[in-house]
Structures are given as C-alpha cells and as structure tokens.
Amino acid sequence: MMAVDPNLFPLIAVIILGGSALLDFLLGDPKSWRHPVEFIGSVINFASQLIIRKVNDKNSRRLWGIFLGLKIIISSGFLAWLIVYLAEKVSPVLAVIIQIIGVASCFAGHSLAQAAQSVIEPLKAGDLPTARQKLALFVGRDTNNLSEREILRATVESVAENTVDGVTSPLFYALLGILFPFVGPWPLAIAYKAASTLDSMVGYKREPYTDLGWFSARLEDYLTWLPCRLTVFMLAILSGKPKQTWAIVRRDGPLDPSPNSGWSEAIYAAILGIQLGGDNYYQGVLKSKPLLGDGIQPLTIAKIAQSLWYSRTVFLWQLLLGLTVILAIQAGAMSEISFNKI
C-alpha cells in the first residue's frame, strides 16, 4: 500500500481487506506455521522476565514498562511496514499478497469459532470433563470444577471479549491503515495486536506485573475503547431491538472495572437475553464480576452458536461499511484534486 496509483486505490483496498477476511474465514491460522503473535509473545516474555529479574525499584519498573510497551508496539508495526516496503521493491503484487496474509493473521474469527466449537461438541455429548479441558485452552479462569452452565457462560463471555479484542478492533486499525497508504493496513493491525498481547501477558494488577504492566494495560484500554463502542453500537442495531439492548449496556457495561470487557459482555448478554458475569476462580483465587443482562432466557448450547453468528455478522458489516466510508473519502479527495486541476 506504499506507492499506490490513486486510480487503483479502491481496488487494492478491497482486495487486501476482502482477501484477508476471506482467508481468515476459510483457513484461519495454519498450525504448521508460527503465528506473528507467537513471536511477539516470545519477545514480550523474554523482555518482561529480564526486567523483573534485574529491576526491583517500583518507579524504575514503571518506566521500563513504558519502554517495553512502546518498543514492542512500534517495532511490530515498523517490521510489518518494512516487510511490505521491501516486497513492493520486488513486486507490487507480492506486497499486496503479503498484506493479505499479514492482515488475515491479525483476525481471530476462525480460531475463535474453532475454540467455541471445541467446547460445544463435548457438551452435546454430555462430556463435561472434556468440555472443561477444551475451555481451559482459551480462557484464564480455573475450569476444573465448572458446571455445565458455568462452561456455557465462560464460552459466551470469551466469544464476546474476543470479538472485540481479536476481530473487530484489528479490523478497525486495518481500515484506518487503508486511509494512510504510506502506512498500510497490516502495520497498524499488527501494532494493535502487539498492544493486545502485551496487555494479556503483563497487564495484571498483581505482582510481579503491577508496575511493569500498568502502561500496557492502560494503553490497550484506550486503543480498544472506540472499536469496542462501534462494535457494541452495531450489535445493538443487528439485534433488531437497539433501544432495549443499548439501555442494558448503558446500565451494566460500566459496572465492570474494565472499560471495554464489561461493554462487550453486556451487549452479548442483552442481545441473547441471558445473564453473564458472576464468580470466577483464577489460580484458586475468587474474583467476583458484576452480573450483566437480565437473564430472561436460559444459557444453552444454542446461545454459543448465536454469539458466534453475531461475531461473524458484525465483522462483515463493519468491513463493508468501513470500506464504503474509506472509498467515499478517497473518491471525494480525488474529485477535489481533479477540480483543482481544471
């Protein structure tokens, strides 16, 4: 997306974003290749453990936390930009292909659906031990003693949070990158994924990450705030009862300490007519989260399937609307240039 012929801009934008969405939907992340986020996670783990061992002072750890966060995010975006830049020197087509693959790797829609489906199958067979084992692969809470309802709740909550963190937020930044051809969609999308990975690895309010991870946690909250609200707003419209669902979200979303996860879970609770939140155990420690939604309907396996449908649908609509807005902006800019030449 670097040196793009303005006349080809709409086509290239559609090819990159549309191709990325299709690639994630059909293939997801092949197990045979190392995902970019895994590499980012390895670097974060090495650097954070080194800082924890070498730095004991509270203020120094906070400063190192800022440095770590900015270094990982900027380096991730720059490396993606450099790869595309060098690829374009070889062939513009190669650069587009790399961007398609790179942006697709930032979308977690396919892997999210697979993870949820891996829990659905044993639940249908009444095999709770296997369902707990599958659930433990993608949630942080203790799963050993969860009841069927708690497994269902944890799965829907994971779909809700990861729809925002792993699907629509990367899409938002990829679309934003399209607006700046010299940057491109992949660098911004992978930079956001780096911020999200930092938050998930060091953004804890417990030692030894309290001081080291504060910056990463706060930054990820800010970066996700707008994409989260846009997703919630669109889900409310897709539900067919926007006024009712929005009222529930406005009531319950702010109850959660997180400025984003409460909203993402509250909208799913509202549109599915269920109740989320409650008591969870993390490494044996009880953590009580606020109850979200009115719980008009029971939590069932069908609710997981419905949550996945909403996840896919809101992604598709945001992709289509985002591209429409971007292409309209580009068309307006081109018209103004043409007018000035007259």
UniProtKB/Swiss-Prot annotation:
The chain crosses the membrane at residues 8-28, 66-86, 93-113, 171-191, 266-286, 314-334. Keywords: Cell membrane, Cobalamin biosynthesis, Membrane, Transmembrane, Transmembrane helix. It is found in: Cell membrane. This is Cobalamin biosynthesis protein CobD. Converts cobyric acid to cobinamide by the addition of aminopropanol on the F carboxylic group. GO terms for cellular component: plasma membrane. Belongs to the CobD/CbiB family. It comes from the Bacteria. GO terms for biological process: cobalamin biosynthetic process. It is a multi-pass membrane protein. One of its GO terms (molecular function) is ABC-type vitamin B12 transporter activity. Pfam families: CobD_Cbib. The gene is cobD. Pathway: Cofactor biosynthesis; adenosylcobalamin biosynthesis. The lineage of its organism: Bacteria, Bacillati, Cyanobacteriota, Cyanophyceae, Synechococcales.
